[in-house]
Structure formats: structure tokens, C-alpha cells
């Protein structure tokens, strides 16, 4: 009985419906698979969903191009690049509308408001510059040698900034290597000036020490001269005084005091041996006889000998302190 009922149900399914077409629930030439694959079922559902809504892909919101991280120089992170190279890269990219080149390609034009929203307000992995403030960004431009040029006086350019640098040009990335931060240049200059400073100090100290040593040696020589001057000057001065006095006595008998100096062309001459003082004329003898020259001879003789001794000992001390191995000023420099 069960088999007959099954055959009747199967024949009813195969019976043609009105119009000669099989019923909607009947099989189409093959028996259905009692255990269909689950992957095939999922594929059928996805195909049905796509057929029901064919415009679903087209209606998805497009990705904002300005929110993408630009891949520069073999996909390196843009945030790790230097400031000039970051700026040059975003100017070269058409993605950013807030920055662009001028007509000559030697200056960058920046829209203040749009640049603030488009570039500086980026967060997280999409961040490009370390600062999010326009004032700090302008300060960075100045530190890297960018100069601001005034745009035209048209009302539409009030929010535009134009900055230029001789090493910041369109399609010339190699020039960016010449752009350096000002504080880095200042530190390099300071290091260059610090090199000869210790040598200069040593030279000054060496010259000063030699000068002090020479001064002390001269002072000692002067003291030696002052201590030895009376013993040297005494006998010669006394001798000259005695001889001048004796000569004055002899000349006093020959020439009275009221008479003037004699005019004898071939008169006797006498050379003294005390202190390099020579009396060679009778006029000098007459001055000695009158007592005018006797005191002057002693004082002049002593001062000349004292000056001679001072100069001699000072020169001797200077020569003694100078060693042959001492470098000259030119060699020290």
C-alpha cells in the first residue's frame, strides 16, 4: 500500500498542468539532490541578493581621496621624511587641493583654511606633519629658509600664502638635499669656530708668561745696577773731580776770573781717563777753572755710567733668558 501511494504521488507531480507546462513544484528532468552542498546554497543566496539589488555596489560611499596616506619613495612612510621633502611631496600630488605650484614652478601656493583642514588636522597614521597649528607650520617654513612673497591685491587671494626657496622647485627633488635647518647651520658654524679657541688661549698664555719673565729679569738687572753703580762711579768721579780741580788751580794762575776764555789755537790739550770724558780745549779748561764745569762733570759722569750699566745688564738679562730652542711668534701661530 505504501508503495502504491508513493507511485501515485510521483505521477501526480509529473502530470502536466493546465497549458501543458509542468507544475511549479515538479522536477525538471532529474531528481532533486536530497543533500545539497552548503557552499552551493550560500553562493545561490549571494547571487540572488546581487540580482535583487544590482546597484548596491555603485551606491556605496566612495573613498575620500584626501584621507589616504600617500606612498612616497618606495612606499616609505611620509611622516618619517624631512619637512622640505614632505611639503614637496604633497605639492607634487594631485590629491591635495590646498597646496599647488605657481606658474613658474619655483614657489608653493597654500590656501590657509583648506590646508588647515586637509593636511594639518590629520590624526594617527594619516598624520603628515608633527604640528597641527598653522603658526607652527609657518615657523618651520622660516627655519628652513622659505621666504614669503605677497600675492596680488585681488580680494580672492587674501587667504593665500606664497612661499619660495631657491632649492624648492617643481620636478627637481635633488635640490631638496641643499635645504637645511637654520639651527643646524648655526651649530656647525659654532663647532668650526670652537676648534682654534684652545690654541689661541695657549698662545696668549705663553706670550704673557714670557713677558712677565722678561720684566722680572729686567727688574733684577736694575737692582744689580743700582747696587754696583756707586763702586763703579765713585773712583772715576773722584778722579775726575780731583783732576779737574787740579787743572782749575793751574789755569786760575794763568787766566784771571774776569777775562774770557783764551783763544789759543795751539794750546795744550789734556785727555782725562775717567768715565770717557775728554777735555781737549783751553775753553773747557777755563770753564773748569771758574768752577762752572767741576760739579757738572761729576753729575753727568755718574748719570752716564749709571745709564750705561742699566742698559748693559738689561741687555745681558734679556739675552740670558732667551733660549735657542724657544719658538718664535710666527712658529707658534
From Swiss-Prot:
The keyword Coiled coil does not apply. Keywords: DNA-binding, Nucleus, Transcription, Transcription regulation. Residues 1-66, 227-275 are annotated as: Disordered. Disulfide bonds: none annotated. Pfam families: HSF_DNA-bind (PF00447). GO terms for molecular function: DNA-binding transcription factor activity; sequence-specific DNA binding. It comes from the Eukaryota. InterPro entries: HSF_DNA-bd, WH-like_DNA-bd_sf, WH_DNA-bd_sf. GO terms for cellular component: nucleus. Residues 29-39 have a biased composition (Low complexity). Its main location: nucleus. Residues 79-182 bind DNA. Residues 49-60, 228-242 have a biased composition (Polar residues). It is found in: Nucleus. PANTHER family: HEAT SHOCK TRANSCRIPTION FACTOR, HEAT SHOCK TRANSCRIPTION FACTOR, X-LINKED MEMBER 3-RELATED. Belongs to the HSF family. This is Heat shock transcription factor, X-linked member 4. It comes from Homo sapiens (Human).
Amino acid at each position: 500500500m505504501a508503495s502504491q501511494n508513493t507511485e501515485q504521488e510521483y505521477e501526480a507531480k509529473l502530470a502536466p498542468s493546465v497549458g501543458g507546462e509542468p507544475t511549479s513544484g515538479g522536477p525538471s528532468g532529474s531528481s532533486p539532490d536530497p543533500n545539497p552542498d552548503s557552499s552551493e546554497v550560500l553562493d545561490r543566496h549571494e547571487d540572488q541578493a546581487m540580482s535583487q539589488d544590482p546597484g548596491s555596489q555603485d551606491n556605496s560611499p566612495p573613498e575620500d581621496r584626501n584621507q589616504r596616506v600617500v606612498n612616497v619613495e618606495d612606499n616609505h612612510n611620509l611622516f618619517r621624511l624631512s619637512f622640505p621633502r614632505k611639503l614637496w611631496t604633497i605639492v607634487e600630488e594631485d590629491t591635495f587641493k590646498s597646496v599647488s605650484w605657481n606658474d613658474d614652478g619655483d614657489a608653493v601656493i597654500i590656501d590657509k583654511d583648506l590646508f588647515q583642514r586637509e593636511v594639518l588636522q590629520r590624526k594617527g597614521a594619516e598624520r603628515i606633519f608633527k604640528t597641527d597649528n598653522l603658526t607652527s607650520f609657518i615657523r618651520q617654513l622660516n627655519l628652513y629658509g622659505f621666504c614669503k612673497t605677497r600675492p596680488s591685491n585681488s580680494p580672492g587671494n587674501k587667504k593665500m600664502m606664497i612661499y619660495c626657496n631657491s632649492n624648492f622647485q617643481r620636478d627637481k627633488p635633488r635640490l631638496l638635499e641643499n635645504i637645511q635647518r637654520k639651527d643646524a647651520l648655526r651649530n656647525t658654524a659654532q663647532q668650526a669656530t670652537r676648534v682654534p679657541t684652545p690654541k689661541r688661549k695657549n698662545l696668549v698664555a705663553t706670550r704673557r708668561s714670557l713677558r712677565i719673565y722678561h720684566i722680572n729679569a729686567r727688574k733684577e738687572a736694575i737692582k744689580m745696577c743700582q747696587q754696583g753703580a756707586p763702586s763703579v762711579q765713585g773712583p772715576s768721579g773722584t778722579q775726575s773731580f780731583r783732576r779737574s780741580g787740579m787743572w782749575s788751580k793751574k789755569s786760575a794762575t794763568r787766566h784771571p776770573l774776569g777775562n774770557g776764555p783764551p783763544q789759543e789755537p795751539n794750546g795744550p790739550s789734556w785727555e782725562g781717563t775717567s768715565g770717557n770724558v775728554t777735555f781737549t780745549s783751553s775753553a773747557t779748561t777755563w770753564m773748569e777753572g771758574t768752577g762752572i764745569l767741576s760739579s757738572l762733570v761729576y753729575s753727568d759722569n755718574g748719570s752716564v755710567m749709571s745709564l750705561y750699566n742699566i742698559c748693559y745688564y738689561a741687555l745681558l738679562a734679556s739675552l740670558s733668558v732667551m733660549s735657542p730652542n724657544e719658538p718664535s711668534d710666527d712658529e707658534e701661530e
